[in-house]
Amino acid sequence: MFYSKSRPQHAARTNVAQAAANEKPKVPELEEFLTKRDYLGAIALLSFRRHANRNDLKNLEWLAYCYFHYGEHDKALVIYKELLQHEDPDPMFFVYSAACLYYMGMYKEAEEQALQGPKCALQTRILFHSAQRQGNDDKLMAYHGQLTDSIEDQLTLASIHYQRSHFQEATDIYKRLLLEHRDYLRSTVVYVALCYCKLDYYDVSLEILGVYLSAFPDSAIAVNLKACNHFRMYNGKAAEAELKTLAELSGGQHLDHDLIRHNLVVFRGGENALQVLPPLSDIPPEARLNLVIHHLRHHEVGEAFGLIKDMEPSTPPEFILKAVVHAMLGQVKGDPEHLKKAQQYYQLVGASASECDTIPGRQCMASCFFLLKQFEDVLVFLSSIKTYFLNDDDFNWNLGIAKAATGKYKEAEETLLQIANDKYRNEYTYTSWLARCYIMNGKARLAWERYLQLETNDESYQLLLLIANDCYKMGAFYFACKAFDVLERLDPAPEYLEGKKGAACGAFQMIVAGKEPKDLLRDVISLLRGNNSADQCEPIVAVMRKWAKNNGVKL
């Protein structure tokens, strides 16, 4: 029997056609996008469907949901408001709108919108957060009492602890939830790492992040936190390198996120701060604080005060920054009220149970005592954290002055000389304290050389006074005589002449005792005869000349 080949050939062609049809790319379903958390893809699909059918309310709900989770809360809010305009809307849309408003930083509006919705756990959480943001502790405690042991409520409580700088309490909640729901809440590991970062345990934070990033290397939040740890431990360049890795993994899309843009400003030492930070307002909360810091670094104290004067501080960084602004304003204006407020803010942080044993807490107590001029106490706190600031010019500036103010001149000189920043080295305060240390350490010549480097102005005049009086007190009479001589030339006041005469006699006594070279006598006599007051100095000169003649000293 012979079989026809025509049917098998036709069947083969049919199978090929079907296979080709099956291989055509399918349009992904919404569920696929949501499973992958590809909210941008979901938004594209839902927007396309919306154009096809604008009356599909379920499609609109999903579009709002995806906008919200993609971080475009303003667009989600517009859709929820549209949904509320339809007949017999779901009252939960009020609660969802409140969530959008909260993330947009509109906390009062979020509270009002949430109260229009039905009583539910989500409403309570939004009201709880809004009360915290508005600083209403009575409402905060009331809503706290309504929280349950559910995962969502406990995560909310941990978040509030974090916002109130109760990082250990937040960590305890996160760890407990991780033990109970390890597979379900893996991302909570990042929150634990965030708390350790805030507690200054940067190495612990990095260790925790390492485990998470090995599974999710493109996590924007985790990579950003790793960058922050590197910034704290190393420098801005090391931090920025981590963000470049994130950019490569994400195709650069994450770099447009407000948080990343904010952190890049910080990592780059304030570069583009005035372009990036003002539009951010308080999202993230550090944006306003970093803008204040930017103004302070550029000596724009008025602008910094304008940003912070109406802010009610609630976290240690806010209290510290407010203290710094008041301290700088008090120094610029000579206003003791601002200095008093600064001292009080520093004390609030440094004496608090949560901060007293932290590095910032001890810095605050040192600053508090600095403003009170209790320098022995300043040294107690600065010495306890010295190992963390070995090459820090700001730290050495404060430590050096505190040591000098307590009479520890040798240590003060060593500390002040470690400062490399010209901003400090060119300040009169630095020059005057270093000059005093030189004199007290028997190096009056170095103090005089510092004076010779200055231009003639009020600061050089003040330094002359310091050199004249300190050298006289320490028995460095030759340089005291030189300083009083210049002072007399600038201002022929009788006290400068008397000072010069006394210093000249002291220098002569040192020469006679063999503690100064005899050749110095020629300079001393020249100083006494140099001004219009030479006649008043002639009796002293006569005694000196007689001694020189008797002792074979050529003048």
UniProtKB/Swiss-Prot annotation:
Membrane-crossing residue ranges in chain numbering: none
Keyword vocabulary terms for this entry: Cell projection, Cilium, Flagellum, Protein transport, Repeat, TPR repeat, Transport
One record GO biological process: protein transport
Leader sequence residues: none
Main location: other
Disrupted gene: phenotype observed: Flagella motility defects.
An example Gene Ontology CC term for this record: intraciliary transport particle B
Localisation per UniProt entry: Cell projection, Cilium, Flagellum
Statement: the UniProt record of this protein carries the keyword Thylakoid: no
TPR repeat ranges per the UniProt record: 57-90, 151-184, 393-426
Pfam families listed in its UniProt record: ANAPC3
Family membership noted in the UniProt record: Belongs to the IFT56 family.
Subunit: Component of the IFT complex B.
Entry function: Component of the intraflagellar transport (IFT) complex B required for transport of proteins in the motile cilium. Required for transport of specific ciliary cargo proteins related to motility, while it is neither required for IFT complex B assembly or motion nor for cilium assembly.
Name recorded for this polypeptide: Intraflagellar transport protein 56
